[in-house]
Amino acid sequence: MIQQSFCQGPFLVSGLHGDQILGARDNQQDTFSILVGEDAFLLVLADGMGGYTGGELASRAAVEGFSKAFEREYLSPGERMKAAVAAANEQVLAVRKRGGKDDEMGTTLVAAWIGREGVCWVSVGDSPLLLIRNEKMFLLNELHQYSEELDRMADEGVISRDEALNHPARHFLTSALMGKEILLMDLREECFPLVPGDRLLVASDGVEPYLNSLGPAGMRYLSMLSAE
């Protein structure tokens, strides 16, 4: 599914592009939303987990809960994001209670608010927020994977670098929205400044091997997707 929306404000001209690829799965467990305002826009993406339909239900509930709460609140972007994450988590809990066999469902979530001050974000889990600048890609948010702990242990000499890189639990999540206590959350309340030509990519973790295979030509292609 592809959705496109374009907005023009006093501070920028932007192109928004959303795409989903099913891949090897039988059903799509990612959900995304684009909310366009007069002088800012909000990108929200969730990558669900938990059974055949559980992940799909959890990601949809999280995105809907987050988006509705963000629109209701009249606070700073950072405060609105914090409140919206709590609302998203409550929505996942409500779906879990109705889910029966899918009661262990959960989802990651990453949201980016882009306005005249730059980009603010919040994320739970391992869905990346990426900045493409001058054909180079930078990870803006913190990924909540066990890989962070393994790399720290390797740096301290507790385990070898090879053991850290090849550990079977390397990509296990250390935080997610499951209707329970949120163990880790990356919240950027002070906006990160953007410069002309910057591109932002909000994605699920499945995009990593694809991006690694693109190389410089791929970076140029990604930049062109939202070029003016």
Regions found by a protein language model. Name each.
Residues 1-228:
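PP2C/PPM-type serine/threonine phosphatase catalytic domain
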